[in-house]
């Protein structure tokens, strides 16, 4: 019975592209909202949809607009990314000037970010699309070469573009982290761009889920001492939390 309902929900989401909990209650009047929320959570864990505020969005729709690699990456460790994104979103205040990268964790941040008057600079196409739903957020999308794996842009003209621009906060996510190599990514141009954007910010918040620990990418863009706040999940090792805290870094 449960599996049949879950499959029906998945089919509805694929057919409509997006569906709200209110609409699901109309289709399943005898099922509680809490149960429907759990069904959506299970479907997201199975990689069949993406939960959004108040409902869910079709993976097929995301693949059409965002590319298959990005759609798959978005659902890897989705629970951890959602938790981290929500924590980071709580730190955004009215009037803030923020840079947010284009990683899949950043998409969850964008979904949870409050709709308050602020200015957001981003290299993420999907991030900008999500933020565009918020009436009070001013969005600056940096152009350049598109990285299809995370739908973010990189460009050699970033220094000129950001020459006279400063941020209160840079919110960055890493593809890999070790204590020896720091935070790293797979693109030299992206690494140089992230170093620049870090330098333009008063505070740097790093979003890092525990699955990235122990991985090394070719290009380091930040070391432990370069960040102010680490935002992570419950599985993050206590020994590493102690290391970050010993360097006066806030761990969330």
Give the ranges of each region predicted by the language model.
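HTH-adjacent hinge/linker in prokaryotic transcriptional regulators
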Residues: 2-7, 15-23, 27-30, 34-35, ...
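Conserved phosphate- and dinucleotide-binding cores of soluble alpha/beta proteins
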Residues: 20-22, 31, 126-252
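Short active-site oxyanion
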Residues: 94-98, 115-119, 226-229
């Amino acid at each position: 019975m449960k599996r049949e309902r879950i499959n029906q929900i998945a089919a509805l989401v694929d057919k409509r592209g997006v569906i709200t909990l209110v609409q699901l209650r109309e289709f399943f009047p005898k099922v509680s909202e809490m149960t429907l929320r759990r069904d959506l959570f299970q479907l997201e864990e199975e990689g069949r949809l993406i939960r959004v505020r108040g409902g869910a969005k079709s993976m097929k729709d995301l693949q059409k607009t965002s590319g298959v690699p990005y759609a798959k990456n978005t659902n890897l460790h989705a629970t951890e990314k959602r938790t981290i994104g929500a924590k980071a979103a709580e730190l955004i205040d009215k009037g803030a000037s923020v840079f947010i990268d284009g990683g899949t964790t950043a998409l969850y941040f964008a979904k949870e970010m409050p709709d308050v008057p602020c200015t957001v600079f981003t290299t993420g196409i999907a991030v900008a699309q999500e933020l565009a739903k918020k009436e009070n957020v001013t969005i600056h999308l940096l152009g350049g070469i598109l990285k299809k794996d995370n739908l973010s842009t990189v460009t050699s003209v970033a220094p000129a573009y950001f020459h006279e621009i400063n941020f209160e906060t840079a919110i960055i996510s890493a593809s890999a982290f070790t204590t020896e190599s720091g935070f790293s990514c797979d693109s030299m141009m992206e690494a140089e761009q992230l170093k620049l954007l870090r330098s333009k910010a008063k505070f740097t918040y790093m979003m890092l889920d525990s699955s990235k620990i122990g991985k090394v990418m070719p290009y380091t863009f930040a070391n432990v001492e370069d960040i102010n706040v680490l935002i992570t999940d419950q599985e993050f090792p206590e020994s590493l939390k102690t290391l970050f805290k010993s360097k006066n870094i806030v761990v969330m």
